[in-house]
Amino acid sequence: MRAADGRTSVFKSGVKRLLGRAGFDIVRSTNNLGGVDDFIPFEATMRAARAAGLSVGDHIDEVMNRTPGATQSTIDELRALGVFAANPNTVLEIGPGSGRYLEKTLKECSPDRYEIYETAAPWANYLVDTFSVVAQPTAGCSLAPTPDGSIDLVQAHKVFNTVTFLCASRYFFEMARVTRPGGRIVFDVMTETCLDPAAVRAWASQGGAGHDSYPAAMPRRTCVDLFATLGCNLEASFLAPMGVASTEVLVFAKGA
């Protein structure tokens, strides 16, 4: 995946293998059916964003995912909840992909260190070069290179809707491990809150073919109870747009 030529074929041939690992920024079907067709190609996306006069993140929200303002609305909610008011000195993001949440996070706070775990090499290199973040080596669903209790804010956006239950669960344990006492953990999952009959009907009728585990559901109570056993309590939650329906963003605080 590091070679420039043949990148498209590599992405396509590796889809099934790589979807088992979080960290890719994915795009819904171009007909807005809510299914995952492919990983976002680096060069084509950069060209299209420049041609449209948009940032990469806004281009993905408005043109590719057809959910204009979705990223900013999530950041606005997190700001209102005081997530950035604590001025996190260290931030870790799982699967930043194109960096649309990363870029807006850096407009809200100025951490000394921002770690990323991103398996798409072209995007990881772009984020390192553009935002001076630290790209950690990826291996399955592990954050092993990051020490225990070293991160003030751990976040993952639109990641756990695309991976299996086992992968998400393993990441949950890792997120709690690396968060310092008093730190926060932010991520979204498609919980039962997002799955009323109308939403299920929308996914069934408009969601396209889906792709492997996408869209993956996760019980809200499972997340809340698990993190409670790891010393992390749910502070707040809110819904954010995803595909033809929504996903629930959960904000946890790790006990001091």
Segments predicted by a language model, with ranges:
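Class I (Rossmann-like) S-adenosyl-L-methionine-dependent methyltransferase catalytic domain
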Residues: 2-88, 94-143, 163-166, 186-256
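A conserved beta-strand element that flanks and buttresses the S-adenosyl-L-methionine
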Residues: 155
